[in-house]
C-alpha cells in the first residue's frame, strides 16, 4: 500500500466500527418452492457491494458510484495493520461506507482486521485448510472426517467470538472452485458440497450464539451458482434458519459477457425473492460494477409487484435440486416441403432475429449482421447465424432486394416467421405463421404460402386456451409476456400447462425492449428474465427485439445469453477475475489481449486469473489457465494442472496459444471471402 493509503494512525475501535444489523423479511412469493427472503441493514433494499484493488482512493470512487459496502483484499499482517489508518482517513473525509475484509488462508489476519472492519469474509474452503492441492483424500472412518471439523472449530472459534464481541458481521462465502479436500471427498464438486461447506462454519457460529452472518455460494457457472443458492435456501428453510444471502457469479469476466453471466445468475435468484446483497464481478475498474449492480437491484426490488400480476398456479415439472432441460421436438421435414425446415431451430438453443424490410433490402450488410458468411455475395450459415428471422412487417411484393434476401435465407435453412395477419395480407412462400394463442383454433385456415404454425403466448392464457392453441401442432411457441408482468413466473405458468398436456413444442423467449433502452439494460434484463428460465431448462431459444437497435448487437447478445445459460457455445468462454490487491499483472489489458487472439475458439474455456491464491481453485471449469505466479511471471495450466511456471509476461500469451495448439484445441481464424462483382 502507498503512503497516501496509510496515513494518520490513530483510529479507535469506536471510530471505525459500524456493526451491521440483520433484519429478516417475509417472502413475497407464495408459489415458489423457496419461500423466504431477507434484507440487510434495517432497510427494505438490496445492498450493492464492490471490491477495489487500491484501498483509499478506490473505496471513495466506489462509494461515490453508489456502493453500499466495499470489500478490500487483505493479504497479510502488513495490510491488516494499515487498514485501521485507511478507515480513519475515510471517516475524516466523511465516508462511512462499511468495509469488508476479504480473507483467505489467514486466521491471524482476520483477527487483526476485526478490530477495524465492519464485516469479515471467510472462505470455508481455505480459511483453515490452506491452499488447494487438488489431491484426492479418502477418509476411512467418520471419526477421521469429524476430527478435521473439530480442528476447524478450534481455528475458527476465536474469530467468531471476536466478531460477536465487537458487533462485526461476517460472510461465510463458499466458492465452487475452492472446496476443501474434505468436502470433495464426501460430496464431490457439487452444490450440495458448497452448502455443507458453509454449514460447517455456520454451526460453529450458532454454537456460540453468533448470528450476525450472511451466506454466499459463488461459482463461475451460473447454473451451478443458482442451484447452490436455491439448495442453500431450501436447507435453511427446513432448519428454520433465516440468514441473508450475498449473491454473485464469481470471475464473470468483462464487458457484455461478464454482465450477461452475472445477470443470469443473480437475476434468476432476485426475481424469486432470494438475495440481500449483490456484487457483479467484472474484469473492469471496480466502480464500473455499480451500474449493472444497480440495474439488477432495481429488477429485484420490483419483482414482487410484477409477480403479483401472475395468476396463482401449482407448479410442476421443475426440480431446483438438479438440472434437466425440458424435452422438445425440433421441426420435422414433410415430403411435400419445398425447402428444408429442419434447421429453423437448433437443438442446443435457437436465436431468432426480428428484422425489417429495410434491413432485408441492404443484402450483404444484412447477411453479415445476421451472422452469415459471404461467398461471392451469397450468404452461408455459420456457427452463430440466426436460425430464423421474424417479420412484423412484410416487404412489398415489388421490393426485389428484400424478397431476394428472404429466398436466399430460406435456401440455407433459415426460417421465416411472421404474424398470421401480416401473412394473410402479403403472403410469403414457406413461412411460419405466428398466431396469438387466444385466437388459435385447431381448424383455422393457414395463410396462403405458409407451411407451419407458431403460437404466441403472453402468459395470461387459461389452461383451455393453451390446450386449444396446441391443436394447431405448432413447430414453436413464442412467449412474449405482457408489460409489468413477471416473465419468470408467467412463463413458469405456461410451462406448467405445457407439461400437464405432455407438449414437446419448442419454446422461444421473445423479449421486446423500448427503442430508448440502453444496451446495458437490455443485457441485464434479458439475462435475468430469460436466463433464469433457461437455467431451469425451460426454453429452447431467445429472440431479443428492440426498434432501431443494431441487428448484429441483438443477435450477439442473444447468443451470449444462450452461452451464459450453458446451452449453445458459439465463442470462446472466458473465466477472468476482477482486480484485487493480490493481482500480479494488468488484468484488463491482458484479458483483452488474450480475447483478441483466442476469441474464435467455441467450446474452449480459458481462465485469466490474477494470482495463485485463488486462481487455480476458482477456474474449475476452464480448459486452460493463465495465472499470475509471481510479479512479472505467469503460470500456465491445462485444467487444474500447472504445466509451465515462471513465464515472462511478455511471452506468456504466445506460450498460451502454443499450449492450446499442443492440446489439439486450436483452429486458425477463417478469412471471409469477399464478394466478387459479376
Positions of predicted regions on the chain:
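Glycine-rich phosphate-binding active-site loops on the catalytic face of alpha/beta enzymes
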Residues: 66-69, 117-133, 271-287, 477, ...
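Beta-strand/loop-dominated core regions that host nucleotide or nucleotide-derived cofactor-binding catalytic loops
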Residues: 402-403, 631-637, 641-666
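Active-site beta->alpha loop and helix N-cap motifs at the rims of alpha/beta catalytic domains
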Residues: 5, 12, 24, 52-53, ...
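Catalytic alpha/beta core domains of metabolic enzymes, predominantly
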Residues: 138-152, 156, 182-342, 430, ...
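C-terminal accessory/binding modules appended to enzymatic or scaffolding proteins
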Residues: 341-369, 377, 586-631
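N-terminal amphipathic alpha-helix/helix-capping segment at the start of soluble metabolic enzymes
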Residues: 1-45, 160, 164-166, 302-365, ...
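Radical SAM enzyme core and accessory elements
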Residues: 370-382, 625, 632, 636, ...
Amino acid at each position: 500500500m502507498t503512503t497516501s493509503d496509510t496515513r494518520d494512525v490513530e483510529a479507535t475501535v469506536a471510530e471505525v466500527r459500524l456493526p451491521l444489523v440483520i433484519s429478516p423479511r417475509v417472502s413475497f412469493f407464495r408459489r415458489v418452492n423457496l419461500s423466504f427472503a431477507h434484507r440487510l441493514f434495517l432497510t427494505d433494499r438490496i445492498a450493492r457491494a464492490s471490491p477495489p484493488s487500491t484501498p483509499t482512493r478506490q473505496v471513495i470512487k466506489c462509494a461515490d458510484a453508489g456502493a453500499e459496502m466495499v470489500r478490500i483484499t487483505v493479504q497479510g499482517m502488513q495490510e491488516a495493520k494499515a487498514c485501521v489508518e485507511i478507515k480513519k482517513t475515510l471517516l475524516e473525509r466523511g465516508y462511512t461506507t462499511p468495509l469488508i475484509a476479504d480473507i483467505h488462508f489467514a486466521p491471524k489476519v482476520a483477527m487483526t482486521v476485526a478490530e477495524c472492519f465492519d464485516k469479515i469474509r471467510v472462505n470455508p474452503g481455505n480459511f483453515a485448510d490452506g491452499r488447494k492441492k487438488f489431491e484426492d483424500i479418502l477418509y476411512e472412518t467418520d471419526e477421521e472426517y469429524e476430527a478435521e471439523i473439530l480442528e476447524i472449530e478450534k481455528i475458527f472459534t476465536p474469530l467468531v467470538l471476536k466478531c460477536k464481541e465487537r458487533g462485526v458481521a461476517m460472510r461465510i462465502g463458499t466458492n465452487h472452485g475452492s472446496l476443501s479436500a474434505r468436502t470433495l471427498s464426501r460430496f464431490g464438486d457439487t452444490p450440495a458440497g458448497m452448502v455443507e461447506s458453509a454449514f460447517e462454519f455456520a454451526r460453529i457460529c450458532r454454537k456460540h450464539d453468533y448470528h450476525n452472518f450472511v451466506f454466499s455460494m459463488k461459482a463461475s457457472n451460473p447454473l451451478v451458482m443458482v442451484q447452490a443458492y436455491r439448495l442453500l435456501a431450501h436447507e435453511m428453510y427446513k432448519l428454520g434458519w433465516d440468514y441473508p444471502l450475498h449473491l454473485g457469479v464469481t470471475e464473470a469476466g468483462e464487458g457484455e459477457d461478464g454482465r450477461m453471466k452475472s445477470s443470469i445468475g443473480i437475476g434468476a435468484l432476485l426475481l424469486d425473492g432470494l438475495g440481500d446483497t449483490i456484487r457483479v464481478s467484472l474484469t473492469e475498474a471496480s466502480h464500473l460494477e455499480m451500474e449493472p449492480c444497480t440495474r439488477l437491484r432495481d429488477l429485484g426490488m420490483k419483482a414482487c409487484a410484477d409477480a403479483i400480476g401472475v395468476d396463482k398456479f401449482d407448479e410442476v415439472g421443475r426440480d431446483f435440486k438438479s438440472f434437466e432441460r425440458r424435452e422438445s421436438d425440433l421441426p420435422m421435414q414433410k415430403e411435400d416441403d419445398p425447402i428444408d425446415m429442419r434447421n429453423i431451430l437448433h437443438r442446443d438453443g435457437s436465436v431468432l432475429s426480428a428484422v425489417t424490410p429495410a434491413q432485408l433490402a441492404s443484402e450483404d450488410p444484412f447477411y453479415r449482421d445476421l451472422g452469415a458468411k459471404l461467398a461471392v455475395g451469397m450468404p452461408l450459415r455459420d456457427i452463430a447465424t440466426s436460425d430464423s428471422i421474424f417479420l412484423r412487417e412484410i416487404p412489398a411484393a415489388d421490393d426485389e432486394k428484400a424478397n431476394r434476401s428472404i429466398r436466399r435465407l430460406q435456401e440455407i435453412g433459415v426460417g421465416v416467421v411472421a404474424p398470421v395477419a401480416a401473412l394473410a395480407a402479403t403472403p410469403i412462400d414457406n413461412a411460419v405463421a405466428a398466431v396469438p394463442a387466444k385466437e388459435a383454433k385447431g381448424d383455422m385456415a393457414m395463410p396462403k404460402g405458409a407451411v407451419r404454425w407458431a403460437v404466441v403466448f403472453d402468459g395470461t392464457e387459461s389452461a383451455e386456451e393453451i390446450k386449444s392453441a396446441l391443436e394447431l401442432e405448432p413447430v414453436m411457441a413464442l412467449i412474449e409476456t405482457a408489460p409489468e408482468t413477471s416473465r419468470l413466473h408467467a412463463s413458469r405458468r405456461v410451462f406448467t400447462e405445457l407439461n400437464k398436456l405432455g407438449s414437446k413444442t419448442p419454446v422461444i423467449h421473445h423479449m421486446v425492449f423500448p427503442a430508448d433502452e440502453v444496451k446495458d439494460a437490455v443485457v441485464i434484463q434479458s439475462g435475468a428474465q430469460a436466463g433464469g428460465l433457461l437455467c431451469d431448462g425451460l426454453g429452447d431459444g431467445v429472440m431479443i427485439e428492440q426498434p432501431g437497435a443494431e441487428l448484429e448487437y441483438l443477435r450477439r447478445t442473444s447468443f451470449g445469453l444462450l452461452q451464459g445459460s450453458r446451452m449453445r457455445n458459439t465463442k470462446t468462454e472466458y473465466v477472468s477475475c476482477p482486480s484485487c490487491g493480490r493481482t500480479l499483472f494488468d488484468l484488463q489489458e491482458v484479458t483483452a489481449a488474450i480475447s483478441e487472439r483466442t476469441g474464435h475458439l467455441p467450446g474452449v474455456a480459458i481462465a485469466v486469473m490474477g494470482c495463485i491464491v485463488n486462481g487455480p481453485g476458482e477456474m474449475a471449469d476452464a480448459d486452460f489457465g493463465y495465472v499470475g505466479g509471481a510479479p512479472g511471471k505467469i503460470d500456465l495450466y491445462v485444467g487444474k494442472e500447472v504445466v509451465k511456471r515462471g513465464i515472462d509476461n511478455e511471452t506468456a500469451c504466445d506460450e498460451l496459444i502454443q499450449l492450446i495448439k499442443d492440446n489439439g484445441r486450436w483452429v486458425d481464424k477463417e478469412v471471409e471471402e469477399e464478394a466478387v462483382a459479376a
